[in-house]
Amino acid sequence: MRSSLSFVGFMGSGKTSIGKRISLFFNIPFLDLDEYIEKKLKKSISDIFIEKGEEYFRNIETESLREAFSLYPKIVLSTGGGVVLREENRRILREKSKVIYLKGEFENLMKHLENKEEHEKRPLLKKGREELYNLWKKRLPLYESCADIIVEVDNKDIDEITFEIIERLRDD
């Protein structure tokens, strides 16, 4: 595999879990962008949203995205679900990596997020279901616009998804 990989998709699609497995398989460093931001600011994403607002977070996210690609010559990067909202971020992802979009239907993604622990980690889950659906719908074309590879995650377990990605990367 010649380039870095970035995983995009809505929350609950498996970006971090699958990214870690792909990282191990190809022996390339893994970085979760949200975790990187939390360590950098010494605050949870939820607290950053509450204390500073989404615009502040999105600025830090763009800055951190640039840093991630400059820190590692080759990386497997798991992004936050909203990273694609900024054209600049989509451009950085496309220029610096092969982008894999983990695509899932809204109801299936929500099933992955039903436990309380997820609600505490993800500030957007505090929004109503209709608002989340609208976010998902708004982001779909943005994910697709920057994706080199689109992988359907519905009705597949993590092993099936990981294997499919490895096969598709080998074919590249």
Curated annotation (Swiss-Prot):
It catalyses: shikimate + ATP = 3-phosphoshikimate + ADP + H(+). GO terms for biological process: amino acid biosynthetic process; aromatic amino acid family biosynthetic process; chorismate biosynthetic process. Substrate binds at D34, R58, G81, R139. It comes from the Bacteria. It is found in: Cytoplasm. Binds 1 Mg(2+) ion per subunit. ATP binds at G12, S13, G14, K15, T16, S17, R122. Its EC number is 2.7.1.71. Pfam families: SKI (PF01202). One of its GO terms (cellular component) is cytosol. Its cofactor is Mg(2+). Pathway: Metabolic intermediate biosynthesis; chorismate biosynthesis; chorismate from D-erythrose 4-phosphate and phosphoenolpyruvate: step 5/7. Its main location: cytoplasm. GO terms for molecular function: ATP binding; magnesium ion binding; shikimate kinase activity. Mg(2+) binds at T16. It is an enzyme of class 2 (transferase). Keywords: Amino-acid biosynthesis, Aromatic amino acid biosynthesis, ATP-binding, Cytoplasm, Kinase, Magnesium, Metal-binding, Nucleotide-binding, Transferase. Monomer. Belongs to the shikimate kinase family. Catalyzes the specific phosphorylation of the 3-hydroxyl group of shikimic acid using ATP as a cosubstrate. This is Shikimate kinase. The lineage of its organism: Bacteria, Pseudomonadati, Dictyoglomota, Dictyoglomia, Dictyoglomales. The gene is aroK.
